[in-house]
Amino acid sequence: MRDINEFYKATLDEDFESAVGICAHDRIAHVWPEIIHDCIDRFDDAWRLDQISLVEVSGAFWTTRRVLDHMLAQGVPVTGSMRDAGRIMLCVPRTDEHSFGAQLLAEQLRRSGYHVVLFINRPNAEIFHHLHSTHFDVFGLSIGYDQSLLGLADVIAEARITSKNPAIAVELGGSSFEGAPSAYSFLNADLLLTNGQN
């Protein structure tokens, strides 16, 4: 908890060096993605409760993004189990402008032993090509904007057809999905995360 509090304060102060130092500390180097994720939730809650200003939350997110980019560029060694838990293709559609959450998720999955390929704003043709040429266990889509839902069922159907793995699992998540998963049954996904629930 102390590490989260310190990281939260450092990012609100836009203190990049301190924030990186907290994440890179040997004692918590294996859990830094969770610290960033928890702080993002705190920023969101504080903003909704009018506890921080727009300037503060914008600066905090900007600093957090810099920290994430720095940690990923450093290639911090994976700790814990090094087993091959499976291959995942995680995609952010071209109609989406977000990628922050997807980058965090990809890093957390890698640390859990998964081989993750992350595609951000890439053409569908390129995605289908990789699905066809490489065996993946999971095809995941992170959807943050409602316009990305348009034609999504067709993308999923095409992904299943072209996939080298005929039993590939299709998993969806992101802020566009709210309410009961049954409302999105027309997408024919194997797993749908709505507000952290499946």
Can you annotate each of these PLM segments?
Residues 1-79:
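Long amphipathic alpha-helical segments
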Residues 103-116:
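Short helix-loop-beta junction
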Residues 119, 123-183:
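Cofactor-cradling patches in redox/metallo enzymes
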Residues 96-100:
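Conserved small-residue-rich beta-alpha loop and adjacent elements
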Residues 115, 135-137, 187-190:
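Glycine-enriched alpha-helix->loop->beta-strand junction motifs that scaffold or abut catalytic
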Residues 87-95:
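Short hydrophobic beta-strand segments
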Residues 175-198:
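Peripheral docking tails and interdomain loops at the edges
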Residues 80-88:
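A short, charged/proline- and glycine-enriched loop
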